[in-house]
């Protein structure tokens, strides 16, 4: 049998509307290989969640992963979830696209946003938000 030349890792992408955080771990998730956040690549706080910041982070992450010997990534996308937003922010899709363009092999892409089974009490009180 041929020797496996690929080494896989997991890219955890947390994408909210305020920030995007990418962490690369080994397959067990126990050892962190590299990580980056929006504040590390842009100056203004309002740009931390932008697709541009996500692309720059993904390029840095891909380079650091290759230096450590990782050739492929499984991707786990997470939004804030629970009582907050359940859809990922604008940086998630841009980060995945930039990782594949940077030469990383993409394995599985899964959504790991926490979803409540009974929900928590909604923000805004009994009468709701009055506009």
UniProtKB/Swiss-Prot annotation:
GO molecular function: rRNA binding; structural constituent of ribosome
One cellular-component annotation, GO: ribosome
Gene3D superfamilies registered for this protein in UniProt: Ribosomal protein S11
PROSITE patterns referenced in this protein's UniProt entry, alphabetically: RIBOSOMAL_S11
A Pfam family hit: Ribosomal_S11
Intrachain S-S bonds: none
GO BP, one annotated term: translation
Alphabetized UniProt keyword annotations: Ribonucleoprotein, Ribosomal protein, RNA-binding, rRNA-binding
InterPro entries attached to this UniProt entry: Ribosomal_uS11 (IPR001971), Ribosomal_uS11_archaeal (IPR019961), Ribosomal_uS11_CS (IPR018102), Ribosomal_uS11_sf (IPR036967)
Domain of life per record: Archaea
Similarity comment: Belongs to the universal ribosomal protein uS11 family.
Role according to the record: Located on the platform of the 30S subunit.
Subunit structure: Part of the 30S ribosomal subunit.
NCBIfam families according to UniProt: arch_S11P, PRK09607.1
HAMAP family: Ribosomal_uS11
PANTHER family per UniProt: 40S RIBOSOMAL PROTEIN S14/30S RIBOSOMAL PROTEIN S11
Protein name, as recorded: Small ribosomal subunit protein uS11
Organism: Methanocorpusculum labreanum (strain ATCC 43576 / DSM 4855 / Z)
Organism placement in taxonomy: Archaea, Methanobacteriati, Methanobacteriota, Stenosarchaea group, Methanomicrobia
């Amino acid at each position: 049998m041929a020797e496996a030349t690929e080494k896989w890792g997991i890219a955890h992408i947390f994408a909210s509307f305020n920030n995007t955080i990418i962490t690369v771990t080994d397959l067990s998730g126990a050892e962190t290989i590299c990580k980056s956040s929006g504040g590390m690549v842009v100056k203004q706080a309002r740009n931390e969640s932008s697709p541009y910041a996500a692309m720059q982070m993904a390029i840095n992450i891909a380079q650091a992963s290759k230096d450590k010997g990782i050739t492929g990534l499984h991707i786990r996308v997470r939004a804030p979830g629970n009582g907050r937003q359940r859809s990922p922010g604008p940086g998630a899709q841009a980060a995945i696209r930039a990782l594949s363009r940077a030469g990383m092999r993409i394995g599985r892409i899964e959504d790991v946003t926490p979803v409540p089974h009974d929900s928590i009490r909604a923000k805004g009180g009994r009468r709701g938000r009055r506009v």
